[in-house]
A protein has these predicted regions:
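Conserved nucleic-acid-binding Ia/Ib motif block in the N-terminal RecA-like helicase ATPase lobe
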Residues: 5, 10, 63-129
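Glycine-rich, flexible loop/turn motifs
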Residues: 16, 129-131
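The conserved Walker
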Residues: 41-45
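Post-DEXD/H (motif II) to motif III coupling segment of the RecA-like Helicase ATP-binding lobe
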Residues: 133-136
Length: 136
């Protein structure tokens, strides 16, 4: 049986979260059944955590390949999501790629094959064209 990431309570405890807000609770129930869910909520209400928890359940820790690509509109959001994933202590390697920094730095990080790639659309497409990572 494939090892998957299932310990949401441990993540919440690590982040110091004792209760989820209503939007987060609804997202945890909705996203597994409807993966194209859109979360609308004010800034600072925990949308990043709300969409990451159910999505991480689908990833396989033992796979050494990009399993999830998160496209974001800005470098700031890419950096934020990468940091949240690291803070969660999931064991999944995540890398953010975005314009405004040397593409050579991205390529070095991508050579270590993250499970999760977060990036702006243009930079992700650039890396696809350069074959910096494999989508198989």
């Amino acid at each position: 049986m494939s090892e998957t990431f299932k310990n949401q309570q441990q993540i919440l405890a690590k982040l110091g979260i004792t209760t989820l807000n209503p939007m987060q609770e609804q997202a945890l129930l909705t996203i597994p059944a409807y993966p194209n869910t859109i979360l609308l909520s004010p800034t600072g209400t925990g949308k990043t955590l709300a969409f990451l928890l159910p999505v991480l359940n689908e990833l396989k820790i033992e796979l050494q390949q990009v399993q999830l690509i998160i496209l974001v509109p800005s470098r700031e959001l890419a950096i934020q999501i990468e940091q949240v994933i690291r803070d969660m202590g999931t064991g999944f390697k995540a890398n953010a790629v975005y314009g405004g920094r040397p593409i050579s730095k991205d390529k070095i990080e991508l050579s270590h094959t993250p499970a999760i790639l977060i990036g702006t659309p243009g930079r992700v497409l650039d890396h696809l064209d350069r074959k910096s990572f494999n989508l198989e």
